[in-house]
Swiss-Prot record:
Provenance organism: Pseudomonas syringae pv. tomato (strain ATCC BAA-871 / DC3000)
Function as written in the Swiss-Prot or TrEMBL entry: Catalyzes the reversible adenylation of nicotinate mononucleotide (NaMN) to nicotinic acid adenine dinucleotide (NaAD).
Similarity section: Belongs to the NadD family.
Domain of life of the source: Bacteria
Designated name of the protein: Probable nicotinate-nucleotide adenylyltransferase
Gene Ontology biological process terms from the UniProt entry: NAD biosynthetic process
Keywords of the record: ATP-binding, NAD, Nucleotide-binding, Nucleotidyltransferase, Pyridine nucleotide biosynthesis, Transferase
Amino acid sequence: MTTLPRRIGMLGGTFDPVHIGHLRGALEVAELLELDELRLTPSARPPHRDMPSVTAQDRLAMVRSAVAGVSPLTVDDRELKRDKPSYTLDTLESMRAELAPRDQLFLLLGWDAFCGLPTWHRWEELLEHCHIVVLQRPDADSESPDAMRNLLAARAVSDPKALKGPGGQITFVWQTPLSVSATQIRQLLASGKSVRFLVPDAVLAYIDVHGLYRAPNTDGSP
């Protein structure tokens, strides 16, 4: 009896904190592509972004609480175990080594991240290990950078369900528009405002219990 290839997705990020935009986008792609598993992968030392505001342990705990019981979303902490920058290529190579040759691996990227790929570490090798699924928002600039046009001409597939083989192709998926960002959430929390309904209840409870993202107390009161 032939075993069907597994279909595994990866969504990386600082998740500082994880919010409904991350989660809704991940779930929509998982359902559309009928993924067996979609791994949210917190980065330890992102090469192209500022260092996270809270510890890796806190970010990991929030992501775990956010996806608990929500199949097929899972958490992969391998980048937090490395004592070096979190290069996506290293993570994909590590994941690919654990899969069967016919298994499909999908890297989820936002539009801005996709347009910035030419600045990534050994970015030309990414498609050797995975398909790339670009999460597209209706309000995003749809003009791709010059460096990506030849790649898109050769590798783009219009139907996300038509991706063939273990990797090597690029497709686009339209997201439900949710205007929420981790920066916005941190700013709201620092100003003492509520972020209810912007993050899952379990994440909000963790933030409250651990006092994360609050403005430092400067008046000397307890």
